[in-house]
Curated annotation (Swiss-Prot):
Name of this chain's protein: Orotidine 5'-phosphate decarboxylase
Assembly behavior: Homodimer.
Protein's gene: pyrF
Enzyme Commission no: 4.1.1.23
UniProt source species: Laribacter hongkongensis (strain HLHK9)
Active site location: K73 (proton donor)
Similarity comment text for this entry: Belongs to the OMP decarboxylase family. Type 1 subfamily.
Length: 242
């Protein structure tokens, strides 16, 4: 499998790497982003950063040529999620996600809301957060992660989403089950010499791609690096050499 195979690129990025912008302010974010290249990665804006900085920051990132994954994990009534996805599409984001546990009607409403957008973002379902253990799922009355992930991934696909967020440990089974065109977005990616931090189900970039992941969300190993672009370039080179 070619790790740089294109899939709905907006800014021409062929790397599978999505850098998680886990910064508290837009000033910190833009200072960091100035050290990156849009051809080398995409960017993820999560809840903390979006709450602090809002759509203005997303506009700035898109204007700089980056594909943006708006990681707000929508989970609400169908009409509300549909409206939010339509606004996200108007922002020009490349990808947006929602909890698959919100159900079929919610996901179908989201799909229909962006179907006629001039640039349609990829719609991704969140299955089981990579921070959660089987014991924590059991406390919620849910089955083990592998079972719940498969159940929600099937539901997301049949509801018309483009892919799901899953750990690399689940990627191979999901790729075999749901097919090559259904995109797998994998957080919990760490370099060989990195700590797991708050992610429980983690894997290295090469191992995750070999397992079937299409996109790799990488945060601290890049954002905390002395030379983020050099680290990113090394990751991409390692993946291209597979």
């Amino acid at each position: 499998m070619n790790p740089f195979a294109p899939s709905a690129p907006l800014g021409g990025c062929l790397s599978p790497v999505i850098v998680a912008l886990d910064f508290p302010t837009d000033a910190d974010t833009l200072e960091f982003v100035a050290r990156l290249e849009p051809s080398q990665c995409r960017l993820k804006v999560g809840k903390e950063l979006f709450t602090a900085s809002g759509r203005k920051l997303v506009d700035q990132l898109v204007a700089r040529g980056f594909d943006v994954f708006l990681d707000l994990k929508y989970h609400d009534i169908p009409n509300t999620v549909a409206s939010a996805c339509r606004v996200a599409a108007d922002l020009g984001v490349w990808m947006v996600d929602m909890h698959a546990s919100g159900g079929r009607r919610m996901m179908e409403a989201a799909r229909e809301a962006v179907a006629n957008c001039s640039v349609r973002p990829l719609l991704i379902g969140v299955t089981v957060l990579t921070s959660m253990t089987d014991e924590e799922l059991a406390e919620l009355g849910l089955p083990a992660a592998a079972v719940q992930v498969e159940r929600l991934a099937r539901l997301a696909q049949s509801s018309g989403l483009d892919g799901v967020v899953c750990s690399a440990q689940e990627a191979a089974a999901l790729k075999n089950l749901l097919g090559a065109s259904f995109k797998l977005v994998t957080p919990g990616i760490r370099l060989a010499d990195s700590a797991a931090d708050d992610q429980r189900r983690v894997m290295t970039p090469a191992a995750a791609m070999a397992a079937g992941s299409d996109y790799l969300v990488i945060g601290r190993p890049i954002t905390k690096a002395a030379d983020p672009l050099a680290t990113l370039t090394a990751i991409n080179a390692g993946l291209a050499a597979r």
